[in-house]
Amino acid sequence: MLFRSEADLSHYRQELKAPREGARGLSSYPHPWLMPDFWQFPTGSMGIGPISAIYHARFMRYLTHRNLLDCQGRKVWGVFGDGEMDEPESMSALTLASRERLDNLVWVVNCNLQRLDGPVRGNGRIIDELEKLFRGAGWHVIKLIWGSDWDGLFARDSENALLKAFANTVDGQMQTFAAKDGRFNRENFFGQNAALSQLAQGLTDEQIDRLKRGGHDLVKIHAAYAAAAAHRGQPTVILAHTKKGYGMGQAGQGKMTTHSQKKLDESALLAFRDRFQLPLSDAQATELAFLKPSEDTPEIRYLHTRRQSLGGYLPQRQTQCDTLPVPDLTHYASFALQPEGKEMSTTMAFVRLLGQLLKDPVLGPRVVPIVADEARTFGMANLFKQVGIYSSVGQQYEPEDIGSVLSYREAMDGQILEEGISEAGAIASWTAAATSYSVHGLAMLPFYIYYSMFGFQRVGDAIWAAADQRARGFLLGATSGRTTLGGEGLQHQDGSSHLVAATIPNCKAYDPGFAGELAVILDRGMREMLIEQQDVFYYITVMNENHAQADVPASVHADLLKGCYRFAAPPSRVKAKAPTVTLMGSGAILGEVIKAAALLADEGIAAEVLSVTSWSELARDGMASDKEALEGGVVSTPFIHQMLANSQGPVIAATDYVRAV
């Protein structure tokens, strides 16, 4: 574990400057790329954290039920904001959590009642709203509303005047109370009627100002957390009432501008010091000196004791885990490498490859097939009986097709994650599996297969978040092919997913035209992730159209992985000094490129064909060469330049994707 030092803290948001001064710095947001030994999860974008927490808790159950890892006793804690609950992803999977009885999941929703621009519910009450939503979805709700300072007032309130006043106070007004001092709150809250005024008698303005909301009371926080940890049979949410900018006083507590507060002036710093009774001199306070108790103080000894009792220090992140052997390519992919001209689609070829990998005694149990209600579309129904569909309660019914070899079989140790019509849920499951090597120290190999149009274009933000978490796995954009999918309707015809994939640095995107190419790419990806433990994931488009498959000999594998290889020289029937042209094609269009070469040969034009497996990998290689030139070092020749070095005529590239790819 690499701890962060005071030198790192003093270089907050100065990671470039820090190494020159013997430090590493501290990123402004938790991020596994900026601090790979420290942060497990990134914090953006809003809404992705909540749904990820739910599916991660479910994935832990999956690991336990499949006897891969005992996750009993472990919990997923998610800390979110009340404003974040407006994101659709935040609330979209609440019923899955209750349906799966995920009592290993606890959410803490910080209800400070404020968004960046203003109140979350100025004319309403967000805590009441969230309570109804969570209870209706089957969650256990713990309301952490008022601190211990209020207990005596509630005890003396025989007329329930406080409860009535709170019930009639909308959040916009509650924010105003948070921003004002004790005198204002005495006059405007307790001054509403005689019963409230009587309750406030004997309290000074300062005491009224110090009345805590529940989310700032350590005793109440402990009670809420203990209750959440002990609850069984349901997921739990703690709705914690707080003040934004707590303790900042007039400088920022409860202010509309609190979020954009960049720094405090000297008077505000001294007021903050006094408010929390910090043992700092005026000079130390205004110079922002760190306050750290010495190692032999009761506080520090207590913290070390608790962390040791709880199993270690947090945050921390594992970067490596045990390697996982990958079977030899010929053991499971001979049908693809040497298909002898058989016709099949690359989507079907992938399903066959997946089925073979699932049978491997070592790698097979770590494979996680994920679908969002399209398994039958992709020809995966044969896997239902082979490995089963995961269900936390097994199968308590007799499926209609029980006599079929494609019968819908659910089981507690089922391997397929069938997520229904929820691409957001499927990608959350994929992320949980793809980061298991780091979070759980257990390498898993997820394959999420979906209609290619409903991946990056549908859940691109979640895929970016997975990339931030240094995910390892495969995304399969299936039944791709803009020109070959016209019958499905325009909304299914993907011409842009590879463009989006190319924007993610640790995503390698391929558009293979043949099953053998696909097999070679899968093999390389598995070795890169499971043996070399590189933090990359692959996006591969696989086609819907059946066509004759070509052999992919070992001699072209290296070039294929770089992005293209020489598929066919000009036909021998073309005259030696005939005009020449180089044709390049990928994926669904490669077959048309091959046909075009034959037509050109009939016209006396010599056309060689390059099969392009990845436009983005070719582009990245070229950009790497440009970078070398800018840095003044040894400049390597881009691979595409090498491939086209002997081309004599025009070069024509064809793809099913937008030209920017």
Task: Report each predicted region and the residues it spans.
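Catalytic-loop motifs flanking and including active-site residues across diverse enzymes
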Residues: 1, 47-54, 89-90, 264-268, ...
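Cofactor-binding active-site loop characterized by glycine-rich and histidine/acidic residues
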Residues: 1-100, 123-124, 380-383, 396-433, ...
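Non-catalytic terminal/interface segments that mediate subunit docking, oligomerization
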Residues: 4, 297-472, 533-534, 555-579, ...
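Thiamine diphosphate
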Residues: 18-42, 48, 62, 66-73, ...
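A short, small-residue-rich loop immediately preceding and capping a beta-strand
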Residues: 39-42, 69-87, 105-106, 367, ...
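Glycine-rich phosphate/pyrophosphate-binding loops
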Residues: 60-70, 435-455, 474, 508, ...
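A structural-propensity feature for long, helix-poor, extended segments
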Residues: 78, 85, 461-482, 487
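Conserved short loop/turn motifs at secondary-structure junctions
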Residues: 80-83, 115, 119-122, 372, ...
